[in-house]
Amino acid sequence: MTQVTVGENEGIESALRRFKRQVSKAGIFADLKRLRHHETPIEKYKRKAQQRRRRR
C-alpha cells in the first residue's frame, strides 16, 4: 500500500505529486486496468514478455 506523510511546511500539491509518482512507480493503475477485464492467454504472454524486457 502506498502512503505519503505530509510534512509541516509541505503543501498539499507537492504531497499529491509524490503520491502520484509512488502509485505510478508501483504499477497500481496498470494492475487495476489489467484486472478489470478478462485477459486472454496471448495477452497474458505479451504482458509477461514486456515485463521481462523492462527488467533487463
Swiss-Prot record:
PROSITE patterns: RIBOSOMAL_S21 (PS01181). Keywords: Ribonucleoprotein, Ribosomal protein. GO terms for biological process: translation. It comes from the Bacteria. One of its GO terms (cellular component) is ribonucleoprotein complex. GO terms for molecular function: structural constituent of ribosome. InterPro entries: Ribosomal_bS21, Ribosomal_bS21_CS, Ribosomal_bS21_sf. PANTHER family: MITOCHONDRIAL 28S RIBOSOMAL PROTEIN S21, SMALL RIBOSOMAL SUBUNIT PROTEIN BS21M. Belongs to the bacterial ribosomal protein bS21 family. This is Small ribosomal subunit protein bS21. It comes from Synechococcus sp. (strain WH7803).
